[in-house]
């Protein structure tokens, strides 16, 4: 569905337009040209004296008679010119009313989504009654709400023997089984490749369907994937990269700018399987996690491009052990301190590290650590996280080769 290519004249009567094709397929020959031309030929433009134009034309007629015989020019008046079929084909188009009112506008003045749906509807008419129809649609989600995207998929699949969609929409992709999706990627050699999705044993089809939008889709659509052990890491690392890029853009970049999608693995036992899945799709895969047993560490390293593993038991301890007292006190001042923690810590600044540890434990997976990092200065963010952000930038944006002198 390309509005600039097809929809610009879909509902016109020009040769080759979708409406013209439908009329020919249905063997309808509109007998309107002669009557339309005759009606327009009898129509005089601005003939009403109240419009003021007839008086001007009368003055021209009087002035003309001063110079030439009357038979040379009589009664100037305005009419529609170029009354030919080809001219009418170009200027006639359908008007459509939208909303609950009666106001109509040319179809090409409708919104992009409306035009796309018009084109799809007309293509469906062309396809009806034909055998072995193949529908190939590029980005059908453009300017279309989610419920309509799903409707498009189901209607097109019913209508055609084979349907091919290219899409970046989770609402489109989740309508297909994993084995029906092919991931396209162009390598550095310029060759376009396709890879199928083979779910690892730890990812059951039910889980894949239930968590497709929230966990799998974004990573499928990106070139690079950062697999985080849990929700806390999945929120904290992007927040740190974004904050550092604001403070020192010459050294750091946000994960979004690097083309990295962050995926919550849901536990360290899932990292290796998910890493193998996305690596098989030709993506650069990175992982971040807490200290792991040697066997699990080796399995993860074998499945990803690079593993970032810190030495603490959890990321909350890593952050609180490597930040400043000023950063913790500033964050405490900005918090609406929970009632149950007010009782345990009447003066939280006196024991800021322990108080925030309890606070983060209650906000596990709820962006508590990410909110803390987002208010830190560069020196207040742990060295390990800063080094990880620098390493990711170096991996995704290798330095340019020196120019020859």
Predicted regions and their residues:
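Conserved nucleotide-binding/hydrolysis micro-motifs of P-loop NTPases
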Residues: 5-8, 141, 169-171, 187-189, ...
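Flexible glycine-/small-residue-rich
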Residues: 2-5, 82, 96-98, 185, ...
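P-loop NTPase switch/coupling surface
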Residues: 2-14, 19-20, 404-405
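Acidic, Mg2+-coordinating catalytic modules of nucleic-acid enzymes
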Residues: 214-227, 231-405
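Extended helical coiled-coil dimerization/tether regions that scaffold
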Residues: 10-13, 20-118, 122-134
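Short helix/loop capping segments that flank catalytic or ligand/cofactor-binding pockets
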Residues: 9-11, 145, 174, 235-237
């Amino acid at each position: 569905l390309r509005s600039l290519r097809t929809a610009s004249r879909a509902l016109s009567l020009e040769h080759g337009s979708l409406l013209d094709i439908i009329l020919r397929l249905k063997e309808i020959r509109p007998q309107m040209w002669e009557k339309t031309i005759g009606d327009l030929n009898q129509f005089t433009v601005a003939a009403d004296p109240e419009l003021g134009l007839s008086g001007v034309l009368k003055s021209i007629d009087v002035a003309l008679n001063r110079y030439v015989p009357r038979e040379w020019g009589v009664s100037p008046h305005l009419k529609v010119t170029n009354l030919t079929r080809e001219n009418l084909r170009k200027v006639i188009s359908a008007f459509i009313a939208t909303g609950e009112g009666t106001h109509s506008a040319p179809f090409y003045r409708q919104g992009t989504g409306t035009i796309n749906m018009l084109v799809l509807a007309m293509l469906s008419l062309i396809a009806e009654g034909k055998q072995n129809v193949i529908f190939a649609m590029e980005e059908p989600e453009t300017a279309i709400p989610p419920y309509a995207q799903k409707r498009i998929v189901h209607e097109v699949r019913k209508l055609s023997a084979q349907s091919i969609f290219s899409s970046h929409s989770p609402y489109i992709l989740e309508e297909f089984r994993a084995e029906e999706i092919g991931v396209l990627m162009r390598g550095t050699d310029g060759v376009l490749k396709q890879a199928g999705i083979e779910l690892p044993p730890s990812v059951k089809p039910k889980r894949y369907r239930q968590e497709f939008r929230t966990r799998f889709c974004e990573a499928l659509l990106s070139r690079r994937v950062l697999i985080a052990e849990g929700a806390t890491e999945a929120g904290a690392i992007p927040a740190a990269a974004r904050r550092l890029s604001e403070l020192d853009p010459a050294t750091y970049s946000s994960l979004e700018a690097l083309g990295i999608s962050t995926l919550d693995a849901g536990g360290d036992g899932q990292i290796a399987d998910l890493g193998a899945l996305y690596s098989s799709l030709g993506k650069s895969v990175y992982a971040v996690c807490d200290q792991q047993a040697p066997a699990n560490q080796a399995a993860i390293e074998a499945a990803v491009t690079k593993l970032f593993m810190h030495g603490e038991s959890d990321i909350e301890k890593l952050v609180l052990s490597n930040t400043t007292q000023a950063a913790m006190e500033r964050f405490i001042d900005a918090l609406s301190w929970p009632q149950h923690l007010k009782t345990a810590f009447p003066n939280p600044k006196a024991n800021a590290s322990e108080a925030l540890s309890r606070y983060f434990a209650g906000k596990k997976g709820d962006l508590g650590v990410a909110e803390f990092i987002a208010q830190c200065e560069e020196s207040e963010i742990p060295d390990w996280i800063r080094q990880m952000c620098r390493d990711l930038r170096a991996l995704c944006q290798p330095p340019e080769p020196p120019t020859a002198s």
